[in-house]
């Protein structure tokens, strides 16, 4: 996943089209979520997908659809080459991460991680709704105001 994250971060910075850059950012966030999920941070991986890919990427695409950005592609390399390159490098990246780790695989780990995931989710939920209730309400109000502001800009 490190190779995919590196390539997608370079492409997110280097591509001229903002929509293509957002797609590369989505790939970057999904690969980070997969890395977190595979390392045992189940809740953080799920939250990366929900928050970054779900909310921020949709908000960016909504803002980019409001802007009329015209760009002229002057490069000699076609974007299809980057896509083919990434597709060809995915098996190398996955085999690089699993090479040498297969001997230490614990078969009971997935079952234990499901039990830990429930405990982790319960802990985070109880903390968010008891100790951090006021900041959660403020974050909700900020999100509502940003949605209302985005709707007001479009009209």
Curated annotation (Swiss-Prot):
Q: The organism sits in which domain of life?
A: Eukaryota
Q: List the disulfide bonds.
A: none
Q: How does it sit in the membrane?
A: Multi-pass membrane protein
What keywords is this UniProt entry annotated with? Electron transport, Membrane, Mitochondrion, NAD, Respiratory chain, Translocase, Transmembrane, Transmembrane helix, Transport, Ubiquinone
Coiled-coil ranges per UniProt: none
* The UniProt record lists the keyword Transmembrane: yes
GO cellular component terms listed in the entry, alphabetical order: mitochondrial membrane
Keyword flag Transmembrane helix: yes
List the protein's name: NADH-ubiquinone oxidoreductase chain 6
Species assigned in the record: Candida parapsilosis
The organism that produces this protein has a lineage beginning with: Eukaryota, Fungi, Dikarya, Ascomycota, Saccharomycotina
